[in-house]
């Protein structure tokens, strides 16, 4: 992250909420509630990292610190800022380009291992739309958690209907049609294209996609930037659509996965440009516990290498849109599937999903030849007056069950 200068090595222990090092593990807390909200999930990653909640340490932290800083509220802000700096350092080491929060100045009274220098007045401005959305999600999720506490969601999950096999549906579609399995996207708008469909009825569109041969559906749940909503996901599931549903959300917190499960999701999206390896590993554990599939999205070779180093991933999405220029180049799919990466994917029998820039049968043929077994398509079919015909036009023939 520009302007972040580590002044000294990590200390042996930093009071919670923070990151501390013990003999063979590291624990990370994102905030008061913590990134690891589910105490029941314990695991040991190959790097000997583990995540666990440490709620009780917070009171000790405030008690110890109050002698030097009178304002306990500021002590808490200092500790939260401190762990964010550690997380940013970890993200930088993994080549993650999306900053999780604005690089604001440290809180009053801070004295620690990090020094933040702002080189220009735009340091607190998002560098691209994905970063802007990520920053907004952090605020939005904090607000939603107050309305829907995790304990309430866990109880709701127990009463939720069982999930459908998202990965299995893609494999079956690929076998049945000879084409990549289609994940058709229910999307009203996007930041780059604006309104895609004025008369937007999510249930009607979902039913048309299913009739047209879609194996699975992707439902945008972001309201601010895509004019979607969790109510769309819930309505499609309640309407009896049989296609497994991907919750297309920008996940920055485990709470969102529980919430998606209560609204009818069968799968969730995890973006490698936003999430550190340790976070992806932990979120995959939650997905497994909730019987959800996870589509892990990458944009470049470094992200692909990171993802292939994480156990438990079955679905990898290659987004052909550049984070820097926002230009779309479907040759990115071929590039990322060549050489060692492609060999590992074939050996592990992973499903690669081609994303962005797919409009014609030639586009589908190109990414299929590169090695994808599924495609995620939104704009080119949602804009059609008849989505069924749009799907047939995309593949060059009818791929429906009839």
From Swiss-Prot:
Gene name of the record: IGPS
Predominant localisation class: plastid
Documented EC number(s): 4.1.1.48
GO terms for biological process, alphabetical: L-tryptophan biosynthetic process
Matches recorded under PANTHER family: INDOLE-3-GLYCEROL PHOSPHATE SYNTHASE, CHLOROPLASTIC, TRYPTOPHAN BIOSYNTHESIS PROTEIN
Name of the featured protein: Indole-3-glycerol phosphate synthase, chloroplastic
Pfam families in UniProt: IGPS
Compartment(s): Plastid, Chloroplast
PROSITE patterns found in the cross-reference section: IGPS
CDD domains: IGPS (cd00331)
Expression across tissues: Expressed in leaves.
Transit peptide: 1-65
Record keywords, A-Z: Amino-acid biosynthesis, Aromatic amino acid biosynthesis, Chloroplast, Decarboxylase, Lyase, Plastid, Transit peptide, Tryptophan biosynthesis
């Amino acid at each position: 992250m520009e302007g972040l200068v580590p002044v000294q090595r990590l200390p042996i222990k930093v009071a919670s909420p923070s990151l501390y090092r013990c003999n063979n593990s590291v624990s990370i807390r994102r905030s008061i509630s913590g990134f690891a909200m589910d105490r029941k999930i314990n695991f040991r990653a190959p790097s000997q990292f583990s995540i666990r909640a440490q709620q009780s340490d917070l009171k000790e932290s405030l008690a110890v610190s109050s002698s030097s800083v009178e304002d306990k509220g500021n002590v808490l802000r200092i500790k939260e800022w401190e762990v964010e700096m550690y997380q940013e350092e970890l993200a930088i080491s993994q080549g993650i380009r999306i900053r999780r929060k604005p690089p604001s100045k440290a809180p009053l009274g801070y004295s620690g291992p990090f020094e933040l220098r702002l080189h220009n007045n735009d340091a607190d401005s998002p560098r691209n739309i994905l970063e802007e959305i990520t920053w907004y999600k952090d605020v939005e999720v904090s607000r939603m958690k107050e309305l829907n506490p995790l304990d309430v969601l866990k109880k709701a999950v127990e009463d939720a209907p069982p999930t459908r096999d998202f990965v299995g549906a893609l494999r079956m579609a690929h076998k049945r049609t000879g084409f990549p399995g289609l994940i058709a996207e229910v999307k009203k708008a996007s930041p780059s294209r604006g309104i895609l469909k004025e008369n937007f009825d999510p249930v009607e569109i979902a039913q048309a996609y299913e009739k047209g041969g879609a194996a699975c559906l992707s439902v945008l749940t972001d309201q601010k930037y895509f004019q979607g909503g969790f109510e769309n996901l819930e309505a499609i599931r309640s309407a009896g659509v049989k296609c497994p549903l991907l919750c297309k959300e920008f996940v920055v917190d485990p709470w969102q996965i529980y919430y998606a499960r209560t609204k009818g999701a069968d799968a969730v999206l995890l973006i490698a440009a936003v999430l550190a390896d340790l976070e992806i590993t932990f979120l995959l554990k939650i997905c497994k516990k909730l019987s959800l599939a996870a589509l892990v999205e990458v944009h470049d070779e470094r992200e692909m290498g990171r993802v292939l180093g994480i156990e438990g991933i079955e679905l990898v999405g290659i987004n052909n849109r550049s984070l820097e220029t926002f230009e779309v180049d479907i040759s990115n799919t071929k590039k990322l599937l060549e050489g060692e990466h492609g060999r590992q994917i074939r050996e592990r029998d992973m499903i690669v999903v081609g994303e962005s820039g797919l409009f014609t049968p030639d586009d589908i043929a190109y990414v299929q030849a590169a090695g994808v077994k599924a495609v995620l398509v939104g704009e080119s079919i949602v804009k059609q007056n008849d989505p069924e015909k749009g799907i047939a036009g995309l593949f060059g023939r009818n791929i429906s069950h009839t």
